[in-house]
Design a protein with these regions (language model features):
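Interfacial/gating helices of multi-pass transporter permease domains
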Residues: 1-15, 80-86
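Juxtamembrane boundary at the C-terminal end of a transmembrane helix
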Residues: 192-198
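Interfacial transmembrane-helix starts/ends
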Residues: 40-68, 85-88, 180
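Helix-loop junctions and terminal segments of transmembrane helices
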Residues: 10, 14-51, 105-110
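Membrane-interface helix-boundary motifs at transmembrane edges
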Residues: 40-41, 45, 111-113, 165-176
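Short runs within selected transmembrane alpha-helices of multi-pass transporters and secretion channels
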Residues: 11-14, 23-26, 62-63, 67, ...
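Short membrane-interface helical motifs at transmembrane helix boundaries
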Residues: 60-79, 198
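Hydrophobic alpha-helical transmembrane segments of multipass membrane transporters and ion channels
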Residues: 52-60, 93, 185-189
Length: 198
């Protein structure tokens, strides 16, 4: 259907380029974290450095898509694909956190937490099915359903990220403040620009 086509294009457009970068960083992180698995202090340091590096790489492009996704898709693919751009706007912040958290999940292997990884994956699968079903049944609106799916994705990605922070004794509150502050600093001026353009 058209909805599937729009969603597929929006997801691939914003996730594929960053997944290549994330995969490369993830391989390096896995190698280094494996070498440091018995040195929790060094492992904590490299985990923080990697997560912040990923955030700094991803925040601007994903913020631009969040604010200007409909314009970008209309310009690149034509006006018939504005809907895909609107979907991308709803998905972008989730994909940002997916980009950040994916390389860090190598710690499941490094710290030998495969059972926890399995539990997280089961929760992810069932919660996604539930949110799509609820969105379709109660709201019958694709935009609301995609928004809820994206919010769920952000929550799940952050839950896994903070799970590792807790294991490595990284201050979770400080990192929440760091993320919220920097996302606001980047996105707010872009929204002002959009308002001026309208």
């Amino acid at each position: 259907t058209a909805i599937v086509g729009f969603y597929s294009l929006s997801y691939r457009f914003i996730s594929l380029p960053m997944s290549i970068i994330g995969s490369s960083i993830g391989q390096v992180f896995f190698q280094k974290s494996s070498e440091l698995k018995n040195d929790k202090k060094a492992l904590k340091k490299i985990t923080l450095e990697t997560y912040k590096k990923l955030f700094k790489i991803g925040i601007l492009p994903f913020a631009i898509i969040t604010v200007f996704g409909d314009y970008i898709f209309a310009f690149v693919f034509g006006k018939d694909w504005i809907v895909a751009g609107e979907y991308a706007q709803l998905l972008a912040i989730w994909i940002l956190f997916l980009f950040i958290h994916s390389p860090i999940t190598n710690l499941f292997s490094t710290l030998e937490k495969q059972k926890d990884a399995l539990l997280f994956n089961i929760i992810i699968i069932f919660s996604r099915i539930l949110i799509i079903s609820l969105g379709g049944y109660f709201f019958k609106d694709i935009y609301i359903t995609i928004f809820l799916y994206s919010v769920l994705g952000i929550f799940l990605n952050l839950s896994i990220l903070f799970y590792f922070f807790r294991l490595l004794k990284i201050n979770i509150f400080n990192e929440i403040v760091y993320l919220l502050t920097n996302i606001t600093i980047v996105i707010l001026p872009l929204y002002v620009v959009r308002l001026l353009l309208n």
